[in-house]
């Protein structure tokens, strides 16, 4: 629910920013068109089969509301907490999207939660808190000047999340709750992509050869021109 409200908040904020800051008068041109890779942070190495339902729930968060629906969606693979996904693992995530799109009526209706006191209230809270964060960034001189501050806040947020999980305050199934489990056929190193070290060595050699043979003067000139244009 909160993830869906975040998308609704983004949509409302973008509409207002486009109208007030940039003077865009056409409501269609102010639509928040976004693509999203849903969060992989919540995927767990323990009981990785639980990651499937986590991925489905995250997909619903960015597709339930028509007015704030992602225009493109990428889902992580169930085993990304274990290692690199194989093509079959990536296909599984693709099939999740296809089942949601073509075997359900998820896309058949408009704003499902329009008028809900819970949804509207939470969305308003998120808009207010997000605007406060945006004001802080603008006060620091914009996104570029605020990079260090934003990185610091991200690290602090992640640290706090880990503290809550380790203390049991935030429940994560299979990690700090309901940890008993039957043996899973999905665990172990056999269920991740293994890259031949020779492939890595060949790629490094190809990159080194390309760098050795490129026209460095042309590269430097192009970078200088790019910097000049960016500063104008």
Question: Which positions does each model-derived feature cover?
Answer:
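Charged, low-complexity surface patches
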Residues: 3, 7, 89, 126
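A general structural signal for short secondary-structure junctions and capping/turn motifs
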Residues: 24-26, 62-64, 136, 163-166
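Structured core elements
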Residues: 33-37, 51-54, 61-63, 72-74, ...
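Short beta-alpha connecting loops at secondary-structure transitions
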Residues: 36-49, 55, 73-88, 105-123, ...
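Catalytic-core signal marking the mid-to-C-terminal active-site face
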Residues: 91, 95-232
């Amino acid at each position: 629910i909160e993830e869906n409200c975040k998308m609704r908040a983004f949509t409302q904020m973008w509409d207002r920013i486009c109208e007030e800051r940039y003077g865009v008068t056409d409501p269609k041109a102010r639509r928040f068109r976004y693509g999203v890779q849903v969060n992989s942070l919540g995927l767990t190495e323990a009981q990785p089969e639980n990651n499937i339902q986590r991925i489905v729930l995250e997909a619903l968060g960015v597709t339930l509301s028509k007015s704030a629906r992602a225009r493109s969606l990428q889902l992580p693979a169930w085993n990304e907490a274990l290692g690199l996904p194989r093509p079959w693992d990536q296909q599984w995530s693709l099939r999740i999207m296809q089942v949601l799109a073509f075997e359900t009526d998820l896309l058949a209706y408009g704003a499902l939660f329009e008028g809900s006191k819970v949804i509207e209230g939470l969305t308003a809270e998120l808009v207010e808190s997000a605007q406060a964060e945006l004001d802080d960034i603008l006060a620091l001189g914009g996104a570029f000047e605020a990079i260090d501050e934003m990185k610091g806040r991200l690290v602090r947020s992640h640290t706090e999340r880990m503290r809550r999980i380790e203390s049991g305050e935030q429940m994560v199934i299979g990690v700090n709750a309901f940890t008993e489990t039957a043996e899973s056929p999905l665990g172990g190193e056999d269920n991740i992509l293994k890259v031949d070290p020779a492939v890595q060595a060949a790629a490094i050699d190809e990159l080194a050869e390309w760098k050795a043979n490129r026209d460095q003067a042309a590269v430097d000139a192009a970078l200088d021109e790019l910097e000049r244009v960016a500063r104008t």
